[in-house]
């Protein structure tokens, strides 16, 4: 029973970390990376699909992405989707290849992005703490129902707290890494 509560808490905390990683990957730094366009949607024969379904995205260099549509007639639609994705990118078609240069971030924009990243990290910490609270409530219910002793509850709460500390430290590490990426010129 105690192990079930701890396992559930750990799984939920891990999901919070994964969600944070996904959110942080969407925040554009000055460097190009192929995951930057993952959430861009392209109209493909009447339905909206992810860009990686209709084109290959590769790194040209540290500051340029190369996008090549699998079908030549899709090139203009892919370029338009990138331009309309509200990422501040200005793609240019060169034959079949769409080159997407990464513009330099201004100091002000970097600071704004750091604020956004810190906010995302704080939201993840709140989610972790909510999982801890739910786990502790479940443990209290087990004590109330006389399924475990108070000593077992206390030990389990300590273990849940250690899990919480571990995941909060991981969030801090992710935040620090992303801030360093953003502030690197």
UniProtKB/Swiss-Prot annotation:
Predominant localisation class: cytoplasm
GO MF entries: ribosomal large subunit binding
Name the record gives this protein: Ribosome-recycling factor
Gene: frr
InterPro entries: Ribosome_recyc_fac (IPR002661), Ribosome_recyc_fac_dom (IPR023584), RRF_sf (IPR036191)
Keywords: Cytoplasm, Protein biosynthesis
Superkingdom field: Bacteria
A single cellular component GO annotation: cytosol
Function: Responsible for the release of ribosomes from messenger RNA at the termination of protein biosynthesis. May increase the efficiency of translation by recycling ribosomes from one round of translation to another.
Cited HAMAP family: RRF (MF_00040)
Matching PANTHER family: MITOCHONDRIAL RIBOSOME RECYCLING FACTOR PSEUDO 1, RIBOSOME RECYCLING FACTOR
Compartment(s): Cytoplasm
């Amino acid at each position: 029973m105690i192990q079930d509560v701890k396992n559930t808490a750990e799984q939920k905390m891990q999901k919070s970390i994964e969600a944070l990683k996904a959110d942080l990957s969407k925040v554009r730094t000055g460097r190009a990376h192929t995951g930057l366009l993952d959430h861009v949607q392209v109209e493909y024969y009447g339905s909206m699909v992810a860009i990686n379904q209709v084109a290959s995205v590769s790194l040209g260099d540290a500051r340029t992405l190369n996008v090549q549509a699998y079908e030549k007639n899709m090139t203009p639609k892919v370029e338009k989707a990138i331009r309309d994705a509200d990422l501040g990118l200005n793609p240019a078609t060169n034959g079949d290849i769409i080159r997407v240069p990464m513009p330099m971030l201004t100091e002000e924009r970097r600071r704004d992005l750091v604020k956004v990243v810190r906010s995302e990290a704080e939201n993840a910490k709140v989610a972790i703490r909510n999982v801890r609270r739910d786990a502790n409530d479940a443990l209290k219910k087990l004590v109330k129902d006389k399924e475990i002793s108070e000593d077992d509850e206390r030990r389990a709460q300590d273990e849940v707290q250690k899990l919480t500390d571990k995941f909060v430290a991981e969030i801090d590490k992710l935040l620090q890494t992303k801030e360093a990426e953003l502030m690197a010129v």
